[in-house]
Structure formats: structure tokens, C-alpha cells
Amino acid sequence: MTENHDAIVTDAKSEGSGGCPVAHDRALHPTQGGGNRQWWPERLNLKILAKNPAVANPLDEDFDYAEAFKALDLAAVKRDIAEVLTTSQDWWPADFGNYGPLMIRMAWHSAGTYRISDGRGGAGAGQQRFAPLNSWPDNGNLDKARRLLWPVKKKYGQSISWADLLILTGNVALETMGFKTFGFGGGRADVWEAEEDVYWGPETTWLDDRRYTGDRELENPLGAVQMGLIYVNPEGPNGNPDPIAAARDIRETFRRMAMNDEETVALIAGGHTFGKTHGAGPADHVGADPEAASLEEQGLGWRSTYGTGKGADAITSGLEVTWTSTPTQWSNGFFKNLFEYEYELEQSPAGAHQWVAKNAPEIIPDAHDPSKKHRPRMLTTDLSLRFDPIYEPISRRFYENPEEFADAFARAWYKLTHRDMGPKSLYLGPEVPEETLLWQDPLPEREGELIDDADIAILKTKLLESGLSVSQLVTTAWASASTFRASDKRGGANGARIRLAPQRGWEVNDPDQLAQVLRTLENVQQEFNASSGAKKVSLADLIVLGGAAGVEKAAKEAGFEIQVPFTPGRVDATEEHTDVESFEALEPTADGFRNYLGKGNRLPAEYLLLDKANLLNLSAPEMTVLVGGLRVLGANHQQSQLGVFTKTPGVLTNDFFVNLLDMGTTWKATSEDQTTFEGRDAATGEVKWAGSRADLVFGSNSELRALAEVYASDDAKEKFVKDFVAAWHKVMDADRFDLV
């Protein structure tokens, strides 16, 4: 985190800044974007359910990145990276003759967009190459870091993704400057388009702040204090140089990135052991960001007219701070300078608030002139580590115990750069550590032999004879599996964590009913395992199998014999290996598939349904067929009748779509906030149905209505069942990485 923010561009709508995508004074050509979203900016954007399509991928259909990475000589790649780090280029000279600190910042900012609330952001897809991240003020001049790495990427081609290369380079930078890293796991496959499914904030101006309410309460799911920053403003909240106030921002933003206080101190101090910030002159010398720069800049941005515009004249954050006397060598120098000097406020050459050591010797080297020395300097957010009553004792302990600090930084850096990769089983390469960490949501080894087809048939019968209804079986399986997030590959049915805190107490899961269902399922499990010899069934498998049995029964009653695919092999997680606080972030505040809408949601239910479908990696047709099927199967929260547009609940029919599209029904809101509606017979006025926004949207939105019409057609009854089963199976197996 060696360069914290950028004071260059202040208006995302200004000419040349690549800001607001809507041209308010004219219609856009289709090649410019806009289109329907310009005319109706609040319409549902179903394109987020079709991201990274195969047609956008230039690689061969049979290309397997994991296999390509496994064949890579990682040591050779690291040697080539190391050579880049100490080979200064005239077009962007290296500070202190070493690009290592720049590359640490690049890797940090690639990973540091991750947030726990929805699992989005992070380094997993190499999104730093694309807008908006490539042009965020906080990522100023990281375009040069990536361009410096092009010779390495060019040499190894598709054997190493940009996503992996950015993080690996951060590790190599640390290692070549004397630090022992905790490890590295590859496996981050690149994508080929910018993400449109991440909400970065409500602001339309760089570095604006409209994301707080009340007593500085940061809007969910955001993880930064201002638009275009990774975490906090290094000058202090909204530029106010108050270390105590800044500490509050630091604690909240780092918490939202899954870091505790000790990890936060280690990361800030460790990152600021290296390199410097850049604020040689006024920000008005700096040009457009990469996305807005002219064609001839070839993807580079922030061209500066201040002096040479580079090296000693570089401007990025507007701050001019070097923290230690050995900025290209691992040391405890950050804490030494933090505690051994008193600091007074000053302004950088660019006019930014920073702190300089009082009456201190000039012990800090100049980045480009070996004859010059400087006094130690700190950012407002650095001083937070000394003056905040929680951070201070941690910082002092690290100062007095350098080995403990080094271990804490190594582990925190590893967590930072791998948090969004999912389970450890997905990590690739020879440098993956043996140690499994709690934040990786570990699962135990499977006990006993797998059940076979005969056992599966027996268990299905027992489940259907257990007294549990189709609704209960289906709802429990959905509640377990639908915790999965494709964003950071957390959650899912494997582990059966639905039986553990915090999931067993989540409001969306109807805790009382869930407890009853789990008791029954555990009885079936225990009875089977006691009489099955070496073969054992996990509760995780049994929950999913119960859902399959329920769906098959409902389909049969609709007149269709179908088998729901089921592959055993899930295991049951333990409380010891479940971080309750970490899993609290996965609690749904809404689940349109169960017609659940919790309190305090900013967006209407239909938007939240789309967001949930996106996190489950569903397409628009899959979302549509699942909603229609779950409604008639009675899978609603608290057995609500909202959206149950059928006279035969528990039977897998296409009634939801047939009755929603019936022109003999008129709809009217029944709540002031227009969250619930009733459908009346147009002729008699009799109330026929009740629905939510997550139901009526399938008749209201033109694209979703087109999908609903497919499933409402007379010839679609069997197709509906088959498509529902396929989409259901996809969700149930979303976290079965062992099957890929």
C-alpha cells in the first residue's frame, strides 16, 4: 500500500476524465455504449448474468489454464521478474533503482478491492487491467507497473495469467528485498472484459464521498471511504489530518476486507517499509487517466507536464513521503521512525497534508539523487498506528519483536492476496504452503466409503418416508447450497455449515423449521451409517439428496419421471474449522428465490434477486426457471404465499408463469412501499394471488417476460421440468470443485 490515493482527477464527468458514461446532452452511438440504459437508467441490467461469454475469450476452447500453469517453470518466471525489478527504464525510471515497491503497491491494489460483504473485488481475474480500476485515482501510475511486466507476460504467454502475474510479482518484489513470504498459490484465470456487476459506490465524481450516513456509517457492501480509493484517504477523512479519526476509517475499511486489527497494522507497516509516495508538484500538471487518454498514449495515462513528468518529477498521490532509510530492504525501520520521532504537519509540494519529523536528522535517501537526504516523513494514516489506543500496543509489540512482525506481515500479505481464491484445493504451484488457515474455510477429509447408486435409492426412499414435506426438503437443500458465492468461491452445500453457527440462526433460514428438518435428517443419517458397514453418508450429502428426492417427487406428480443428478462426496465441517464472524458476512439480507426481503435493503427486491443470481453464477434463463419452480414447490421464507401462483403446491408445474401472464388478472400494490401486490380476477374482482416485486418482475421486465413466455407455453411443461432440474443441479454442485 505504498501509494495511497491520487489527487489528480477530481471530476469523473469532466472532459478527458473517462467519467460518467451517460452523455446527458445527446444520444450515443451503439458503439459508444449507453443505448437502452441511457433512456432507462434504472432498468434491470440482465447482462450481469451473461458476463465473460465464451465468444469474448480469444483462447482455444480446450485451453486449460490450470494445466498450463502446472507446466510452468515458476522459478524461471521469478528470475525474469527479479531482473525486471532492478533494470530501470528511461521511460519510467525506478525509484532507488528498484521497481519492487511499485510492484508491491500494484499487487496490493489488485487484491485490495476485495470486500467480505459480497465477495466481489480482489485479484482473482486481473481486473486491474480494465476500467474502472485501471483509472481509479488510487491506482495512479500502476499502468506503468503492468507495462514494465509485459516482457515477462509476452515470454510466457498464456502459461501465466495477468491475474497471477500481478500477485506473483508482488511476492518476488518482497523476496528480492529481503523478506520471506508465506507462500504463493496460482490459479487465477484471466477474464477478457471489465466487470459490470460490482457496485463501487453512488458517486459520479472521483474522490467524492456520498456513501456515509448517520455517525459515519459506511454503506454496504462498499469497502473504501471515497470513490476511486482502495481503502482510506491517507491525508485523513476527507483530507482532515486527524490520525484518530483516520484510525476509525482504517478499522472499518480493513474489517470489510476481512482483516483484524493485528493484520491491519502488519499490512500498513509492512507495505510502508518499502518505497515512497509521489507528489513532486501540483496535480494540475497531470493528464487524463488511461481510460480517457488519447489514442496515441496506447493505454497509458496520467501523463505529466511537471518537469520531466517522471522520476524525481513524478506525481501520483500528491504526497511526498519516504518512510525508512532502507526503502528497498526489509527492516523494522517503519516502526523505528514512527515511535522515535515527534511529527509536525506540513504540506507536500503538491499541497497535500503530510507529517515531517521534528528536529530529526536527514537520514532518508532521495529516490533519484544519491547526494540528497531527507527527514523522516509519515502519512496521517501512518500516525494512526501510533495514536489509536488499539493500534498503538500492537504497533509497539511489533516494533519490539521484529520476528513476530515479519510473521504477521507474511501471513496477512498471503491472506490479502489469496482471500478471493476459494478453498486451498484450488491453489496451484510448488509454493502453496502446507498449513491450512481458518480463513480458507477448511473441510475435513472424507470418512468411510462413498455411497453407491443402490444406497442413494434407499436413502431417497427413507427421506420421502421421514415425514418431511417436499417443501421442507427443497427449502433446506436450497438454504444450504445457495450460500455459495462465485465471487470469492465461499459458501455452498459442502460442509453442511447450515447446521452450525451462524447459519442455523439466520432469519432467512427459518431457524425453528430448520432445526426440525436437521434433526430428522440426522436421524436418517445415523440410522443408515449404523447399518451400512464401511459406507457412510455425510449430512451435507443427505441435505442435497433430500432436495433431489423432493424435486423428483414433485416432477413425478406433474407427470414427468426425471432423475436429479447427484454425486456423493461432500463432507461435514466442524465448529473448530468454522470462523463464525467470517461467515456472518454471507448472511443474505434478501433472497428472491425464497421471496425473502430483510429489513434495511436499499434496493428493490427485483434488483436484489438479480444480484443473488449473479453471485450464484446463474444465467437469466436459469434464474427465471428456478424462481418459477421454487414458488410452486413452496420454498418461500416462512411458507409465505407470495408468488405461489398454483392450486397444486408441491407439484413441479409451470403454473407460476402461466398464471403470472394471464391477462385475466389485474395487479395492485397492497403496501405503501409497493413491495407486495395482489392479483384480482379482472371480471369478478376476486383476489386470486399475492406476489412480491421479485415475482411480478417476470411479467413487467420485457426481457424477463420473454423468458417467462417460453416457460408458460403449452409445449413447455416438460422443458420447464428439465431446465429446472439442470439449474437446480448447478446450484447444488456450485462448490464441488473436486468434480471439476
From Swiss-Prot:
Q: Which SUPFAM superfamilies does this chain map to?
A: Heme-dependent peroxidases (SSF48113)
Catalysed reactions, semicolon-separated: H2O2 + AH2 = A + 2 H2O; 2 H2O2 = O2 + 2 H2O
The Gene Ontology biological process terms listed for this entry are: cellular response to hydrogen peroxide; hydrogen peroxide catabolic process
Which CDD domains does the record cross-reference, listed alphabetically? catalase_peroxidase_1, catalase_peroxidase_2
Q: Which residues form a coiled coil?
A: none
Q: Which domain of life is it from?
A: Bacteria
Q: Where is the composition biased (Basic and acidic residues)?
A: 1-14
Recount the PTM note. Formation of the three residue Trp-Tyr-Met cross-link is important for the catalase, but not the peroxidase activity of the enzyme.
Annotated catalytic residues? 109
Pull one GO CC term from this UniProt entry.
cytosol
Sequence position, cross-link Tryptophyl-tyrosyl-methioninium (Trp-Tyr) (with M-257): 108-231
Q: What is this protein called?
A: Catalase-peroxidase
Naturally occurring in which organism (per UniProt):
Streptomyces reticuli
**Gene transcribed to yield this protein:** katG
